Amino acid sequence: MADKLTPSDVKGLFEKLSNWGRWGKEDQRGALNFITNEKRVAAARLVQAGESVSMALPLATIPAPDNPNPVTHLMVQAGGDAHEQALPYSGDYFAIAPHGMANTHIDALCHVFWQNKMYNGFDASEVGSHGAKKCAIDVTRAGIVSRGVLLDIPRLKKIEWMEPGQKILPEDLDAACLPWLHERRIAVLGCDAVSDVVPSGYDGIMLPIHVGTLVAMGIHLIDNADLDAVSSTSVKLGRNEFLFSMAPLILERGTASPVNPLAIF
């Protein structure tokens, strides 16, 4: 595939790679349907060392340029109030806006739209002021357990980090692009940023990876994963594959959930 596609090429890919109707016209799970019971059993057999690694960032409570909606953490009851209670306890309250570039989260298939449609052709109007009636994040209520593979592009290129705006091409993954993901039946894609280059470089297409995965193929996205520890563990053990396990919160009608993805080697 050429390095630079035209906007028309990208729009054509959305149609060519579409999974709409693949699992029925009412399907809301998308590529999660690729994860069968047999695949979960096979993934469990990947555990050899028993080492479990988190791929989540701490919830960001401090305002920053990349965190305009910080997590609110308030104490409902604290230790200093214990003497006033028949049963002393501590408790807290959290308010989270999961989307953005600060917190590790999984996008629901209703998160973005293309030509006023979400995955499987459901209309954007299915998401209203009370949340999403279709393709909400609670379709993941049984958890996501499968084989995980780390694609460590900086290590492949023998560099410390990727430069801002630097693209990852298919040859980087075979020695990310939409056809590569489609051919391999990827169920979930995660990244230490937001998977898309910003700006995209394609007129009229703001987030082509988001549109191609969430809308066209029904692939859920994990944004802002912390991959440093899993990368170092991968190097130490000489393995890039592991048992992947994640249980998003059951947020009915939600467009996302904060998550703590685990890699178990």
Where in the sequence are the language-model features?
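Active-/binding-site microenvironments in catalytic and ligand-binding cores
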Residues: 1-265
